[in-house]
Every structure is written in C-alpha cells, then in structure tokens.
Design a protein with these regions (language model features):
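Substrate-binding/active-site clefts of carbohydrate-active enzymes
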Residues: 1-90
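Glycine-centered small-residue hotspots that permit tight backbone geometry or close packing
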Residues: 13, 227-228
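A short, structured beta-strand-centered segment in the mid-to-C-terminal lobe
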Residues: 36, 40-43, 230-241
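A non-catalytic, amphipathic alpha-helix used as a structural packing/dimerization or gating element
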Residues: 45-48, 52, 211, 237, ...
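Conserved alpha/beta catalytic core and glycan-binding cleft of carbohydrate-active enzymes
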Residues: 58-60, 75-227, 233, 247-283
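Residues that form generic nucleotide/phosphate-binding pockets
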Residues: 152, 238-241, 245
Length: 284
C-alpha cells in the first residue's frame, strides 16, 4: 500500500498494518509498504475490503497485481536485504496462506466470481485448487504472451523472421495454467498508440491490428479486450465479428485447458512468417 500521511503506514504510531520488521516493510522497487499477513486483524481487513466490493458494487471478479511480490520474500531484493522463512527458503508462507484463505472464502460465498493473478515469477500451479494445496486462482494473466506478440509486431517486416519464435513460444506453456490473454489499454495503450508502434503505411498498420486481435481470439486461453473510444466503425465491426465467431465455434474455447484441443499445422515458417493450427472441440 502507498506511503502518505493519511494512509495506513504507522496508522496508530506503530507498524499496525505493515510488516513488523523495518527491513522488510518497504518494497525496494516501488517504495510501497507490505501488508503483515501474519496479523489476523490485517487479514480480516483485506478480506473485508474484498467483500465490500462484492456486496456493494457487485464486481465480477478481482485481478491481483504483482502477486509474485507477495509470494517471494526476495522479490526485487538483493542478497542481504531479505530474511528467509523458517525452512530457509524464499517463499512468503503467510502470504501463501492468506491467498488460499481469501480465494476459498470468496469462492464459497460467490462461486461465479473470477479470481485472476498477475504474476511473472513462474510460481507453479497458481490456478490449481486450494483443495490440492495450491492458491486457487481461476486464471493467470498472461503478460508473457502479450509481450512476445508485441515484440514481433513492432519489428520491421523484413526482420520478423528473427522474432518468429515469439509467436509460437506461448504454446510451450499454454496448458501449465489457465490463462487470460489480453490486448487491452493497460497492455498496448490506446488503439492510436498501438497503431503508432506498428511499422508500415496506415493501411498496413490497420491490417496488422486486425491480425493481432484475430490471433488473440484464435489462440488457446480466455480473452480480454478493452479497446478505447478511438475504435472506428470498421474496427468495431471487425471486433464484433470476431466475438461472434468465437461464440459460435466451440472449438475456440471448449478445450482451452486440454492440449488435445490444439494441433500445430505450421510453426517453422520463418521466412514466410506464417503460423497455422487447428482448434478442436470435443467429439459429440
């Protein structure tokens, strides 16, 4: 949580909400305070906040940012700047238990709520169940997929053969978690800003934009798009048609979590810059 005079830092003059150890209380990358997940009061406070949004505002779900900063004691810290847990490892055991408790109690009261983790530290099985002693998120935000696709798109066409693997890398791990794929404003900026990053003429930029959203919708994983108000009528119609295509073809979603629902046709076409694959639905 942020540090300012009217905030939670030393709320009553003592470290009430933050980690008790001064050396571990402030995150060195962002200068923010870290919650004390050992304290029952702090855990109740955080869970009450979640239920306030659920009860009063009827939100559809939560995306939890930087979950790796919660889970790893040494996240963003150099040697000597962090204290190991009782097993002499770098996992934040209290944060793990808090997330399990939060996710399980939210799901018990609101079974349809989506719980999404944004985590880049390769924590295993984020989206496996609490019953299996994992964290119980529904989905993991696939920032790696977005980053790889953008690095390919922003390259000059003649140089894209050197970035071709960025298009196919995601299928190496696509079934290790349940992923959310996104090309929203948070990832690419406004559509105008997105287009400015792409090479070529205005017509070529528009074609690449359509290809990017098409690849998003056809790739395994749950989709999230949030184009801004700059969307013109042609692009709006294209996105509408993509959504209709997705809804009307179960092969694009029915086996998202099963590798049997995907088959590569072409994934070594470096010079032509073509990828081809089959998406499959379960047999009737």
């Amino acid at each position: 949580f942020p540090r300012f005079d009217a905030g939670l830092e030393k709320f009553d003059g003592t470290p009430l909400y933050e980690v008790q150890d001064p050396a571990m209380a402030v995150h060195p990358m962002w200068g923010t305070m870290l919650y004390n997940y050992v304290s029952p009061m702090v855990k109740d406070f955080l869970i009450s906040n979640a239920f306030f949004w659920l009860d009063e505002f009827h939100v559809d779900g939560f995306r939890m940012d930087d979950v790796d900063a919660m889970l790893y004691l040494d996240f963003g810290r150099e040697a000597g700047q962090w204290t190991a847990n009782l097993y002499s490892s770098n996992e934040n055991l209290q944060a793990m238990e808090f997330l399990k408790h939060l996710n399980s109690i939210v799901k018990k009261q609101y079974p349809g709520i989506l719980l999404i983790a944004q985590e880049d530290g390769l924590w295993p099985q984020l989206t496996d169940s609490v019953e299996n002693d994992h964290l119980g998120f529904d989905y993991k935000w696939s920032g790696g997929w977005t980053k790889d696709l953008l690095s390919y798109l922003e390259a000059e066409p003649l140089d894209r053969r050197n970035y071709y693997d960025q298009l196919t890398l995601s299928m190496m791990y696509a079934y290790s978690e349940h992923y959310v794929l996104t090309l929203g404003k948070r990832d690419v900026g406004t559509l105008k800003e997105f287009l400015e990053k792409l090479p070529g003429s205005s017509r070529q930029k528009d074609a690449q934009l359509r290809a990017a959203y098409g690849y998003l919708m056809l790739h395994p994983g749950v989709k999230m798009t949030a184009p801004d108000g700059d969307v013109g009528p042609e692009m709006r119609a294209y996105l509408h048609d993509l959504n209709e295509l997705y809804r009307n073809h179960p092969a694009l979603y029915a086996m998202d979590g099963n590798s049997d629902g995907f088959e590569w046709i072409q994934f070594t076409s470096y010079d032509e810059n073509v990828v081809a694959f089959l998406r499959k639905a379960e047999k009737p």
